[in-house]
Curated annotation (Swiss-Prot):
It comes from the Bacteria. Residues 179-194 have a biased composition (Acidic residues). This is Large ribosomal subunit protein bL25. The lineage of its organism: Bacteria, Bacillati, Actinomycetota, Actinomycetes, Micrococcales. Disulfide bonds: none annotated. GO terms for cellular component: cytosolic large ribosomal subunit. It comes from Kocuria rhizophila (strain ATCC 9341 / DSM 348 / NBRC 103217 / DC2201). Gene3D superfamilies: Ribosomal protein L25, beta domain, Ribosomal Protein L25, Chain P.
Amino acid sequence: MVDVITIPATLRTEFGKGYARRVRANDKIPAVIYGHGAEPLHVILPGHEMMLASRNSNAVLDINVDGEGHLAMIKEVQRHAVRPEILHIDLLTVRRGERVEVEIPVHVEGEVAPTAIHNVEENVLVVEADALKVPEYLTVDITDLEVGEHVYAKDVTLPGNVTLVSDPELLVVNVSEPVEQDLGEESETEEEGAEGEKPAESTGEEPGDDE
């Protein structure tokens, strides 16, 4: 399950692009907290801490503004087109016990049968879970699966507090036969091509002579 990350914040009292640039120059990030019908709360967040927290899109943050905590999840991160810089963050307020719809990464474990290979067709699944009990990933066990077998979204084991939102028939893992490349034929073709080439006739002139 994800941990709640406490982030210190200050209220934003000025607005405009110029002010936002000055904020980012001081390794801070402008952000807004909204949701549940409350007035949007504009804040300034610490850049390094938020850069780390934003690596997990389902992280639950406890934004501490003047001693008051605000539980929130990252809704959107606006990044610079070229530089590794966060320009702005939208945070969605959540409440303890509230269920949220999130995308969870799929982790494959185990090895298929020796005569087979597996292909991951879907890297994430959409689920509904308690905001404070969102799993970091969903495990898909492919141990000893044979050629022609499949794992669908409905086959993935979910924690007790999690329900599937994605299409149950969504293909997650496909087990197939390895595709063999006939290197013998390719080698013969190359040899035939080489035998068919005729050496270029010498003109007696050095390359680059235009006289």
